């Protein structure tokens, strides 16, 4: 492979590092550019999500480059949701009918560093930090970067933007006139809080993803290897009950004492975390096309960022990398054919998980605590046990398989019709039994 065939990957986050590994294994020389300093030598940004949920799609991508065992060594399996009511005891809801399948809480930084180490160790990958893309010629492949030493230019035969939801590559393609985009932001934002270890141990059950559903607000907590939990509070960004309305220590303490009373004694730095951690934005990014001239392409969040409520952002981006690798195989490494094929294969799937993630937000915030929801989940798990392989819940198909997201949506629509009928019958039967019992008492 000659020097002119070098591939530039812009963004050394999760997707970019994995992509660099896959391309290098194909024999390409890869230049991996990152706007930040080397993350292995610094500390994470305050308030930046420090853990994520890794499931089968992400594990499949890691397995293909031999990194699954290393990454999973520090993973914490979560086999279900622990629902925390305002009053009363928490209730565990299993993710799978068998109860033995789990999604995995992983340190974002540790995962990024493992992928970065793997990429940097390959002889045909070079990594350039502190390189912020400020110019791109899509037809010529020439890039301009802002660095601490001033502006520098570089040229690549193919430029791939793996630089996240705020992608500079996508911005350059927009300026060029090569694509259109839509950014749909939620009225909700998020703020991260911390539950430290209690007496050196986890303060909550580490085998569950904890959810505090409160209707207008919601909080989740994921375990970390250091026995802490990272909590994420989701709340409207503006209004009378929102992040904007709450600022004084007394008001913060009162809010949590009222809505999240079991959290207060577990989070001694609650007020400080709330006051100093930033409010993050939540939104869905869509754009088309994902490539221009067969030599500049977008992948992962740069092409299709989603809200985090299905825990599929990183998993979906990793699956993108696997699919692009497959397209290069089928197109004999002809990028002008592989990039359009990649978009054709992935765009419907990206839209499907974007919609499912938004729907899951409503489910987590409003429905998980309701008796009807619990009955429906019990019916689903019963059907999974009674019809193994023939009936599979949406959550299992998304999290524990590599079934294409769009196919999952189609299959689940048909299944939900069955579940709805059975659940309605169960509720009616229960109501009839109650009425009969009351009648006998009279």
Which positions does each model-derived feature cover?
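Beta1/beta-strand and adjacent pyrophosphate-binding region of the FAD-binding site
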Residues: 2-15
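Active-site-adjacent segment of FAD-dependent monooxygenases/related oxidoreductases
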Residues: 42-118
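Conserved FAD-binding catalytic core of PHBH/FMO-like flavoproteins
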Residues: 117, 122, 131-135, 140-282, ...
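Conserved hydrophobic helix-helix packing surfaces used for dimerization/oligomerization
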Residues: 7-9, 30, 296
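C-terminal helical "tail/cap" subdomain of flavin- and related membrane-associated enzymes
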Residues: 3, 326-442
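Conserved Rossmann-like nucleotide-cofactor binding loop
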Residues: 15, 38, 166
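Glycine-rich FAD pyrophosphate-binding loop
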Residues: 24-47
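Conserved mid-domain beta->alpha element of the FAD-binding
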Residues: 12-20, 25, 161, 193, ...
């Amino acid at each position: 492979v000659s020097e002119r065939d070098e591939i530039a990957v812009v963004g050394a986050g999760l997707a970019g590092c994995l992509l660099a590994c896959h391309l290098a294994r194909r024999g390409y020389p890869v230049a991996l550019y990152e706007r930040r300093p080397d993350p292995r030598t610094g500390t994470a940004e305050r308030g930046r999500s420090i853990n994520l949920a890794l499931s089968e799609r992400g594990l499949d991508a890691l397995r293909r480059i031999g990194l699954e065992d290393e990454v999973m060594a520090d993973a914490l399996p979560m086999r279900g949701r622990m629902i925390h009511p305002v009053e009363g005891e928490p209730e565990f809801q299993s993710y799978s009918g068998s109860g033995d399948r789990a999604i995995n809480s992983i340190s974002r930084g540790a995962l990024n560093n493992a992928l970065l180490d793997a990429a940097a160790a390959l002889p045909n990958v070079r990594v350039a930090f502190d390189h912020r893309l400020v110019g791109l010629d899509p037809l010529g492949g020439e890039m301009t970067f802002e660095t601490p030493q001033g502006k520098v230019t570089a040229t690549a035969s193919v430029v791939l933007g793996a630089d996240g939801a705020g992608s500079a590559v996508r911005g350059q393609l927009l300026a060029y006139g090569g694509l259109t985009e839509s950014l749909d932001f939620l009225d909700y934002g998020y703020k991260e809080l911390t539950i430290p270890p209690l007496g050196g141990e986890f303060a909550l059950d580490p085998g569950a993803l904890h959810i505090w559903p409160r209707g207008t607000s919601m909080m989740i907590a994921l375990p970390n290897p250091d026995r802490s939990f990272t909590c994420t509070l989701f709340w409207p960004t503006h209004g009378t009950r929102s992040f904007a309305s709450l600022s004084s220590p007394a008001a913060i303490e009162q809010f949590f004492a009222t809505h999240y009373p079991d959290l207060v004694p577990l989070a001694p730095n609650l007020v400080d975390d709330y006051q100093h951690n930033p409010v993050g934005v939540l939104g869905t990014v869509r754009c088309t096309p994902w490539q221009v001239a067969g030599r500049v392409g977008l992948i992962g969040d740069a092409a299709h960022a989603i809200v985090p409520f299905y825990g599929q952002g990183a998993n979906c981006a990793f699956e993108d990398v696997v699919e692009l690798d497959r397209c290069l195989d089928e197109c004999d490494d002809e990028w002008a054919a592989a990039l359009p094929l990649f978009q054709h294969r992935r765009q419907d799937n990206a839209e499907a998980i974007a919609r499912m993630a938004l729907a899951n937000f409503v489910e987590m915030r409003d429905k998980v605590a309701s008796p009807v929801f619990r009955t429906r989940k019990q019916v689903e798990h019963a059907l999974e046990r009674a019809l193994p392989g023939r009936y599979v819940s949406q959550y299992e198909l998304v999290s524990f398989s590599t079934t294409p997201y769009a196919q999952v949506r189609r299959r689940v629509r048909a299944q939900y019709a069955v579940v709805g009928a059975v659940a309605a019958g169960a509720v009616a039967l229960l109501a009839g039994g109650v009425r009969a019992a009351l009648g006998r008492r009279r």
